[in-house]
Amino acid sequence: MGLSDIPANYMQGSHPHLTLHPQQQHHQNQQHLQHLQQMQQLHNAMPTPAQQAAQVLAMESNELLMSTKDKLSSKKKMHLLKKIKKRFGLVRRSPSSCPGPNNLPPLQFHSVHGDNIRISRDGTLARRFESFCRAITFSARPVRINERICVKFAEISNNWNGGIRFGFTSNDPVTLEGTLPKYACPDLTNRPGFWAKALHEQYCEKDNILYYYVNGAGDVIYGINNEEKGVILTGIDTRSLLWTVIDIYGNCTGIEFLDSRIYMYQQQPAAIPMATVPAQQQQMPQPAANASSALNSHHPHQQSRRSLPGHTAAIEHDLERHVMPSLQSLHLAGNGGSVASVEQAAIAHDLANGLPPLRYNANGRLIPVPFHNTKGRNVRLSQDRFVASRTESDFCQGYVFTARPIRIGEKLIVQVLKTEQMYVGALALGLTSCNPAMLQPNDLPNDSDFLLDRPEYWVVSKDIAAAPQRGDEIAFFVAPNGEVSISKNNGPAVVVMHVDQSLQLWAFLDVYGSTQSLRMFRQQLPNMVAYPSQPQVNVNASSSSACNAASTSRMLPMTESMSSLNAGATAKLLHHPSQLSVAQSTSTLASAGGVNGSRMISMPSNGDILQIQPNGGGTVLVVNLPPASSSHDINGQLAARPTATVTSSGVLAGACSSGTLISTTSSQYIEQPIANSTNNAANKWKDSLSDQQSTDSSAECTICYENPIDSVLYMCGHMCMCYDCAIEQWRGVGGGQCPLCRAVIRDVIRTYTT
């Protein structure tokens, strides 16, 4: 800065004692010049007040701008992250996590509604009394932001498809009277000011409770039974009043508005915080005597415990860690400590690996079932082949097979380990006579229905469990009459299909749709024992029977005997065919075919049948035993009864007496009684069977009642119609279903009698 940069008033007004007149410039004092130079140097060293103010303002503005940008950037990032989490349902909230108004009256239905709607119960219950549409309803008052609408599914029908549609509208329902369309989606949603979406049909179950609300950002969050599912709608205009709109569509025929305040209060967990529990109780497991009461106290909240907030996770973990082993030890106490320790070790292993313990089928000895190496291309098996998991990016090709054929009456339990609600559909169950070892991965189609086109015997039932959840247990078994029954979570068994029980069948599962991972168990039957091959039969001798004395030990030909019982090791008589039992594990089975030809004999506890199944392959022989009423007096005639042997030709070979095979089709066997006192009962039973079979063979068609039955329905296998009526039924008359079991008819096979 030079002299030219000095303000003009600096030399004139600011410092009058330093003012220089032009006539005195040549006569200025040297001291004055030095003083001026010093003042100029000082002026150059420090900025002017204006410059100082400008610098300060610039620095403050830069700091403010930078801090504002940083704050805005961080806020935007956090807001964007939260929005992404909410959109994908990654943020789980309980009904009390989002504050909403609690001073509003309970919701009621508006007087403006669809033609098929009837309002009752003080305006809180809406029913659709006919058809499946024209059932649009509104709330009687506008709803607030974050106000939760709780809807209970009061009535459900199975005659339709689809579920309710729900959402919001900014149009006053009064203005819509007389102009409501049939459907909310898409008739109403195509108009401005309407937002609605369909609820998945799997959630539309009786007594389920749907809750939803709209937040300030215009997102609609919904949940089922106190478990939040995520965002279902976006872009709601929250600047105006909003009424909720519900279309009672499809299978949902009746809904009820619940008071959200009461519902939220009832759903609050009543768990005791861990801090209030004494240290001794936290460290020590519960006694076995108190285990049952502990479980009963938690049982009503089992469904809600799955969605409890994170602070109760420790309580749930301790419950599974201490109570469940104690409960397992209750029914295993009589079997020895080693068995109980094995069961507890298995439960501990499951909990350590994050697998849910068995809850509904814990009674009885359960054995894990390994899966076959043959599987679908999108399935991964664990190292021990006990757990099957489908890849998350695919929804099909999840086939897994049992490693061995199943047995008649054997109970198999499938436990669901993981689900994904993004996909539609669920687990499929099937049975086949095809050995999985003969299949290639390319032989398995994406849709399990196409397995029916293969030359082998295949039966499939899709969606065996409606919307399975983690921990659900689906049990199934094949009855002696070919019925395949399924029960979910130890509920009532339902017959889903009929199979040919005379074939050797492998079970298979299609880990499809929402089902992601599962494992399988089988229940050990106490009266199903595998016997080694030992081609001889020891028959107990008795002094009261001469023929038994002559044939105490009898060798059976290798080509004749299929399987028989040897009770020599147990020194016990087989009292009657209807009372066959395996007393001890030391019993042996005389079987043909060498070491590899061992057989499996199954005698259910009801004593009505005798099942003999070859492990290496072949036809399963099922013998229907006579009723116990035709038995002779055990005390008086027991010694006169020889032990019988079931042969491959269907004839019973015994020491003195032989049996009669009534029909090779039904494999019903009658043994000729020796005692005269039993002739009448046996003859009556034989005559009744003969009359029944003659009646069945000449039975009339259940449709026309004129022609005899001469057709078989595929896949259920029922014979109830003549061929002409079956063809008409198959082509759509009556819905193309079997009139007995309502199974879909896929083919009609004509039969001929000689």
Swiss-Prot record:
GO cellular component: cytoplasm; cytosol; nucleus; perinuclear region of cytoplasm; plasma membrane
SMART domains: NEUZ, RING
Pfam families: Neuralized, zf-C3HC4_3
Gene Ontology molecular function, alphabetical: DNA binding; phosphatidylinositol phosphate binding; ubiquitin protein ligase activity; ubiquitin-protein transferase activity; zinc ion binding
Entry keywords, A to Z: Developmental protein, Differentiation, DNA-binding, Metal-binding, Neurogenesis, Nucleus, Phosphoprotein, Repeat, Zinc, Zinc-finger
RING-type Zn finger ranges: 701-742
Sequence ranges assigned to domain NHR in this UniProt record: 106-260, 368-523
Keyword Cell wall biogenesis/degradation: no
Cysteine disulfide links: none
Any one biological process term the GO annotation gives: positive regulation of Notch signaling pathway
Subcellular location: Nucleus
Residue positions where Phosphoserine is found in the record: 338, 341
Protein name (Swiss-Prot/TrEMBL): Protein neuralized
Organism per entry: Drosophila melanogaster (Fruit fly)
